[in-house]
Amino acid sequence: MMSCNYSFSSISPSSKSAFTSPSNFNLNPRLICCSAGGTVAEPKAINATQPLLLDAVRGKEVERPPVWLMRQAGRYMKSYQLLCEKYPLFRDRSENVDLVVEISLQPWKVFRPDGVILFSDILTPLSGMNIPFDIIKGKGPVIFDPLRTAADVEKVREFIPEKSVPYVGEALTILRKEVNNQAAVLGFVGAPFTLASYVVEGGSSKNFTKIKRLAFAEPKVLHALLQKFATSMAKYIRYQADSGAQAVQIFDSWATELSPVDFEEFSLPYLKQIVDSVKLTHPNLPLILYASGSGGLLERLPLTGVDVVSLDWTVDMADGRRRLGPNVAIQGNVDPGVLFGSKEFITNRINDTVKKAGKGKHILNLGHGIKVGTPEENFAHFFEIAKGLRY
């Protein structure tokens, strides 16, 4: 197990009891005020040519782990809730350049994370592939014509991002200028199996019987669909990178539904194909893979060729680091539910995660997206502690 010694230079007085303070402990750091009442340590000047997150991923020496949180732009923030009142439809918010930029920057302006992720959805490309869908409040994704036959799959079109989702490229270009290398601008896409799960099931699912019936009864049909998604997502990643994204995360949210042997057939080869394709044209673009429920798959994930594996909270960080090996960086993996706890509890969990991750090649994050109802002041506290860490 890797280990490191680190100190905390921006911990609030109420949290000090959780740590042994070093002699140079700074009790009065400069702070940024949070609209929710919390504070975040003011960031130091960052190398204008290389965001901290990119240095960490590439194995360079860094003073602390970079930090950003999945779903950091969104529903837990009061400012986002106000926008939702004005623009109640999700796609009205996620397909409008000005709103995408505004929402993406909301957490950046308050908390200064080391990664600023595009506000969007993994299903955004579907319309451009001739798969009509919507995201309905209280119900989630709805696929109007689920794909379940070879004829259905045949109708799926080639995805051309610059024609189908130009607002994504425009938003990323603006974000890159706004953030100005003080943080890494992050794009993201859905993994082929996860996208296929949505379009076959017709939306979210509890049992995944339809996608599994297709996988086990008509695997050729599913493979044809997965191939179309793999080709399209590779294009989408390149488009995002060319538009300004400095790293891209691939979400395989439903990998948890696959046994290891089925992951090797229906997910791994398509993830590897995406990575190989992107690396041909963008060899230095960091690619992050988040596969939910991947505790039984960890040794297989580096085989995709990604630069970073993002762990969910069901994997012990020290065990995950050991099983993944030294050649990939690691991201995660605080339980999102921890943010409902006390500030001392949150601090202790951050402490535990960073210690187990070891020094370097670690991006501090949650093990899943932020949950609805998370107190904004606890979110602020997470960043205050995280940005005060020192190896």
UniProtKB/Swiss-Prot annotation:
Pfam families reported for this sequence: URO-D
Family per similarity comment: Belongs to the uroporphyrinogen decarboxylase family.
Pathway: Porphyrin-containing compound metabolism; protoporphyrin-IX biosynthesis; coproporphyrinogen-III from 5-aminolevulinate: step 4/4
Protein name in the entry: Uroporphyrinogen decarboxylase, chloroplastic
Keyword Chloroplast carried by entry: yes
Main subcellular localisation: plastid
InterPro entries cross-referenced by the UniProt entry: UROD/MetE-like_sf, Uroporphyrinogen_deCO2ase_HemE, Uroporphyrinogen_deCOase
Binding site for substrate: R71, Q72, A73, G74, R75, F90, S120, D121, Y198, S253, H368
Superkingdom of origin: Eukaryota
GO cellular component, one term: chloroplast
HAMAP family linked to this entry: URO_D
PROSITE patterns: UROD_1, UROD_2
Phylogenetic classification of the source organism: Eukaryota, Viridiplantae, Streptophyta, Embryophyta, Tracheophyta
Keyword Transit peptide: yes
Gene: DCUP
